């Protein structure tokens, strides 16, 4: 046991204080044969920083990264351009923490950006109120289902076949331990499902993703009316938040709760997180909304100020009264989202969405001309589903050998599910060039030849 700042006298004083003769006495319950009493034979010497950097850089060079090769990956995580000013602002010492302001009124800057974040989210989703962010879209969806059960006092959730399977698994895990019924529909690559017959008097909510995992935008108006007629709530899930710059916001189609994955704005792709969840709802439901709500007020002198209006989480109130155990959430990612959205503005956000759609239309038209390839979508935003003449996974692997990230095989998202082996999800964003598209089209032609 070596702790370098301690002298031998310090160690003896500590041992005397706790009443043991030596360090070995602390480990008397550990068999002698299991104790390490000498250096392990055969271990290489440690490396210096330069050597470690060289070793790890060599390992990393074996990877194909979305920024270094033509990439058409999507399925819930998208590569978009993030202005350098976003990261530069995040480096400010006042912001470089995602930790909850336990004395919130002292941190007026933090509360102000959270208020602006909420305003942006409410505007793009077409809703009346939004919270100060969630961990990500998947956990936000699970929280939305729990919120619906509290509001309706029912325990059945219907999940669309177009909902991302990872979101579905998070919802099933969360609701399963509470004894709720989760009616998850089969994957729906052709947008043919009819959810209306599934909505009954026991249904708390229906969860629909738009655009769906397979790229189909959904008109939610009829489904929203059917849900409301049965006393159920409609939860809309958006995994590509840029689509809200072009498509009708779910709130304007009657959705009661809107959950989005906000990674596309301000947050680059990364290996496993963090992301940022957006959560918006109707004002009449605000007291059952999870997380925190930042509000604007005036102080005793009439000056504008910001406060945490609602914090109905178990760290602040009695556990049995809490609507969520959401903790530090994704504050820094929410700030990145806020800065990027402020830089874009409403017109810039819409222009970004139109550019994404135009890129995807161009790519889909070119891929549809490849012999044996079929585009399954009549309409889409920046992602669509291809049906290939052979299983998609080996095709994607062959294209990766050509340094092209062609997309996500649907079979990877639904392992063991029959009938999906030849389907491939392809996404195009503003980062994709004509040369990228040329590489994919020509590469696919060669692999399928």
UniProtKB/Swiss-Prot annotation:
Disulfide topology? none
Which GO terms of type biological process are on file?
A: glycine decarboxylation via glycine cleavage system; nucleoside metabolic process
Q: Gene3D superfamilies this protein is in? A: Aspartate Aminotransferase, domain 1, Type I PLP-dependent aspartate aminotransferase-like (Major domain)
What InterPro entries does this protein's entry cite? GcvPA (IPR023010), GDC-P_N (IPR049315), GDC_P (IPR020581), PyrdxlP-dep_Trfase (IPR015424), PyrdxlP-dep_Trfase_major (IPR015421), PyrdxlP-dep_Trfase_small (IPR015422)
The record ties this protein, via Pfam families, to: GDC-P
- What EC number(s) has UniProt assigned to this enzyme? 1.4.4.2
Reaction(s) catalysed by this chain's protein:
N(6)-[(R)-lipoyl]-L-lysyl-[glycine-cleavage complex H protein] + glycine + H(+) = N(6)-[(R)-S(8)-aminomethyldihydrolipoyl]-L-lysyl-[glycine-cleavage complex H protein] + CO2
Q: Give UniProt keywords alphabetically.
A: Oxidoreductase
Name the CDD domains for this protein: GDC-P
UniProt KW Cell wall biogenesis/degradation keyword: no
What GO MF terms are annotated?
glycine dehydrogenase (decarboxylating) activity
EC top class named in words: oxidoreductase
* Biological role: The glycine cleavage system catalyzes the degradation of glycine. The P protein binds the alpha-amino group of glycine through its pyridoxal phosphate cofactor; CO(2) is released and the remaining methylamine moiety is then transferred to the lipoamide cofactor of the H protein.
Per its UniProt record, what NCBIfam families does this chain match?
A: PRK00451.1
Q: Which family does it belong to?
A: Belongs to the GcvP family. N-terminal subunit subfamily.
Q: How does it assemble?
A: The glycine cleavage system is composed of four proteins: P, T, L and H. In this organism, the P 'protein' is a heterodimer of two subunits.
Protein name in UniProt: Probable glycine dehydrogenase (decarboxylating) subunit 1
Q: Which organism is it from?
A: Rhodospirillum centenum (strain ATCC 51521 / SW)
